[in-house]
Amino acid sequence: MISSNDFRTGTSIELDGSVWRVVEFLHVKPGKGSAFVRTKLKAVQSGNVVEKTFRAGEMLPQALLEKSTLQHTYMESGDYVFMDMSSYEETRLTAQQIGDSRKYLKEGMEVNVVSWNGNPLEVELPNSVVLEITETDPGVKGDTATGGTKPAILETGAQVMVPLFLSVGEKIKVDTRNDSYLGREN
C-alpha cells in the first residue's frame, strides 16, 4: 500500500484492476476543508490518461512491477521479440506495448521489460543510445557561426535535431527521454 501523500512522477498504483502510472501530481491544501492530491494518471496497458483526485493520506495498492533485462532479437509479423539471455526464453510484445520506445529500438539492444502479474506491459530504454545518422541536409561551411541545428533521421527512423556540422554516416548519442542530441560517438 502507498499513501497518496507519497505520490511521485512515475509511481505505479493498482486501480480498478489495472496498472496506472502517475504522470503529474499536485498536493492541494485549501484554506477550508481537508487537503487532497490532484493527479494525472496514465493506464500502462492502454495508454489512456485520466485526472483523478485522492484525499491526502488515502492508502492505495501499489502495483508490484517486475523488471527484467531482455535483448531485442528480431521482429516477426508486427511483434517485437525479446530474449532473456540467461534462460533463452522469448517474450513477444506488440507495437502498442512498445509505444514510442520503438523509434530508438534496434536489434541486439538490451532493454528492461516491465511486467505485472507475469504479463509484459512496456519497455524501458536506456537513458541514452548510440545511433547512426542516415539522412540529413549537408553542412555548408560558415553555417556554424550561429550555432544552429537541423533535422536528422537516424537508423531506426527517429528524427532528432542535430548541430549543422554533422553529416550522414556519423554516430551520435541521443537522450531517449527527451529526444535530444547529446554528442558525437566514435
UniProtKB/Swiss-Prot annotation:
CDD domains: S1_EF-P_repeat_1 (cd04470), S1_EF-P_repeat_2 (cd05794). Pfam families: EFP, EFP_N, Elong-fact-P_C. This is Elongation factor P. Pathway: Protein biosynthesis; polypeptide chain elongation. The keyword Cytoplasm applies. It is found in: Cytoplasm. InterPro entries: Elong-fact-P_C, NA-bd_OB-fold, Rib_uL2_dom2, Transl_elong_fac_P/YeiP, Transl_elong_KOW-like, Transl_elong_P/YeiP_cen, Transl_elong_P/YeiP_CS, Transl_elongation_fac_P. The keyword Protein biosynthesis applies. It comes from Prochlorococcus marinus (strain MIT 9313). Belongs to the elongation factor P family. GO terms for molecular function: translation elongation factor activity. Involved in peptide bond synthesis. Stimulates efficient translation and peptide-bond synthesis on native or reconstituted 70S ribosomes in vitro. Probably functions indirectly by altering the affinity of the ribosome for aminoacyl-tRNA, thus increasing their reactivity as acceptors for peptidyl transferase. Keywords: Cytoplasm, Elongation factor, Protein biosynthesis. GO terms for biological process: peptide biosynthetic process.
